[in-house]
A protein has these predicted regions:
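Acidic/His-rich, divalent-metal-binding segments that scaffold phosphate/diphosphate chemistry
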Residues: 1-77, 97, 101, 161-166, ...
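Short alpha-helical segment immediately N-terminal to, or the first helix within
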Residues: 14, 119-122
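Histidine/acidic-rich helix-loop-helix segments that form or flank divalent-metal centers
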Residues: 28, 68-111, 124-246, 264, ...
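General alpha-helical segment detector with a strong preference for membrane-spanning helices
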Residues: 35-36, 95, 118, 146
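Active-site-flanking alpha-helical
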Residues: 38-39, 91, 121
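Phosphate/pyrophosphate-binding active-site loops
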Residues: 52-53, 63-64, 114, 118, ...
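Active-site-proximal alpha-helical segments within enzyme catalytic domains
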Residues: 60, 105-119
Length: 282
């Protein structure tokens, strides 16, 4: 929280953001207060949360919003934004899967702060990692906030690891084959038959896979031999593998959550989608 406060204030000041600096700093301080009501086993784990763990974690923004609304006289703008600090502009966040203008400017700022601070403990180049994470998938975060972290990383002159090597068939190759398989499966399941909810899950998978494909294609180092890649290139490819695998895992989890409202027959029919999206984490 100590670092989140000035970061939120700095983002509010930058580029004439339509956010009150004082509220931004207070939001940076308080945004994770809802985690006090989450079981410790679901906090700061080394492995990504499974579906049950995610269900526990995804309520903490809403808990914080309700807590602050009921026990303080803080403005509704601040309480709402704290409830939105895990949302993403493209609708891939939680708890409400909001998108676009449905997320308040302060909520979007706190979401960028949350993502940045989640990478602060990284042993090497945390700002460079955060800058990449905010920009790698188009549409997740507004440029006005990701550019702040990009400039911070550039001005920090962080040293990137020089001992990273990405084998030809490693993480990014796995991302590529996973995207291809999941896209093919989802396309095969497109039909006018079935419930509206079923159709929405298939369309969600296709839309999100297309975004991840766009991010994968934009890396710009394909066709180069390992000897032609700089340490910065190797580091970026390593970051891309981590971030894109994480997005695949999140999409799998989101599809499975939405499918809980389907009939058993439709769940079974769509299960190949999340089977294809299954990823391995180091």
């Amino acid at each position: 929280a100590g670092q989140s406060t000035p970061l939120a204030g700095g983002m509010a000041i930058a580029q004439n953001s339509p956010v009150d600096v004082r509220l931004a700093m207070l939001g940076g301080l308080l945004h994770d207060i809802g985690e006090a009501y989450i079981q410790a086993q679901y906090l700061d784990g080394e492995e990504p949360l499974d579906l049950l763990g995610h269900k526990h974690m995804m309520v903490h923004p809403r808990i914080a919003q309700l807590l602050l609304s009921a026990t303080t006289d803080y403005p509704a703008t601040l309480c709402r934004a704290i409830g939105e600090h895990h949302e993403r502009q493209n609708g891939s966040g939680f708890p409400a899967r909001l998108s676009g203008d449905a997320i308040s400017p302060l909520g979007m700022l706190l979401a960028a702060v949350e993502n940045t601070m989640s990478l602060a403990p990284a042993p090497h180049a945390p700002l460079t990692r955060a800058s990449f994470a905010l920009r790698v998938v188009p549409g997740e975060y507004p440029d006005r906030f990701s550019s702040v972290v990009f400039n911070m990383a550039r001005n920090a002159h962080e040293q990137v690891p020089t001992n990273i090597r990405v084998p030809a068939a490693a993480a990014l190759h796995h991302v590529n084959t996973t995207l291809q398989a999941a896209q093919q499966t989802a396309r095969a399941l497109q039909t006018n038959i079935g419930s509206t909810e079923r159709k929405a899950i298939v369309q969600l998978a296709l839309d999100r896979i297309a975004r991840l494909r766009q991010a994968w294609n934009a890396l710009g180092v394909w066709g180069l031999s390992p000897e032609q890649l700089t340490p910065e290139d190797h580091f970026e490819m390593d970051l891309a593998g981590v971030e894109l695998n994480q997005r695949l895992y999140e999409l799998q989890r989101e599809c499975m959550l939405l499918a809980e409202n389907l009939t058993q027959a439709e769940k079974t029919e769509l299960s190949p989608i999340w089977a294809d999206l299954k990823v391995k984490h180091a």
